[in-house]
């Protein structure tokens, strides 16, 4: 990473609280899952399932993405972050809104508290989007990565707007269709528009960098951008206005866009100069492999296959879980220990490099905890998905407990890095000087 990029980095007090809040949210999410096994036997529009979804989407995934973007945006775009004050305000609003919305959904309070939570979250999204767009405007050489990142925040604001309208519609019905109709729109533009586009934009820059690869041909990324956005725009227009029901076609466009991104990563991996992958990168490729399940299921749930209603409801649940607990969570679990240790190391040891013997970023966390975290996570995920599909609460509970173990190991490792202190640094030549005096 260049010196210019390091100098563009924002204050650690903007970035690190996002990681702390996200780690706690992941533990809360998995513990709530333990107490929600009874909610997986029916429709996905259930207070406990809505709670789990929003803790996963907001407190866990969006929170850590906000913090990561503040740190990585200067890396990807090679400019300074537009405003740290906007970032701090967005963090305060996102964290407060997430807590209030979680309480509201768990108890299904559809009144004032839920309204306030939705408004706080929407304002947080607008502030974050403003920060990203204004930062991107400073770019001298615009690339496809900037297209992905700027477009993703547009979809984030759109997702938040639909969410606000739905929240107020609970108490003051004014939308022409039922809640489930808009929930599908809200969920899909959030998952594919916000999460997927941002992951592709950042991943197309960072994953080759971690692999020590420098692919110059990014035509597949351009195809990815237009296919994903084209499918989303057509889906939203059809869902709201046209009602042709060609959802499988739009899904195929988005999936084709994902395939183009994966092809780009395949090229990068082939060019990579790093022969051995660490646990973080292995987990990242596990996350990409986990994409296969929701890709298959999106066609199963959109095509009229005449499946029994109980099975179809279970497949809808597995589809959603495979995205948030599967792909997104696995990616975060893998990338956290590629990014967070470097951020803490940079702010702790930047002034000592070259003069003192300093630890490496990988020395700041426990590889043993990370290894057991990954094992507990994968076994727990398989148990959770199998239990939902088979409608077996005991298997769901086993999966939830293992995921809770993984979340505690993850949080412990995160706070080990966050609480790292500089101590007992020895200058270069110290050992030789010490031997010379003996």
Language model segments and positions:
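Hydrophobic alpha-helical transmembrane segments of multi-pass integral membrane proteins
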Residues: 1-438
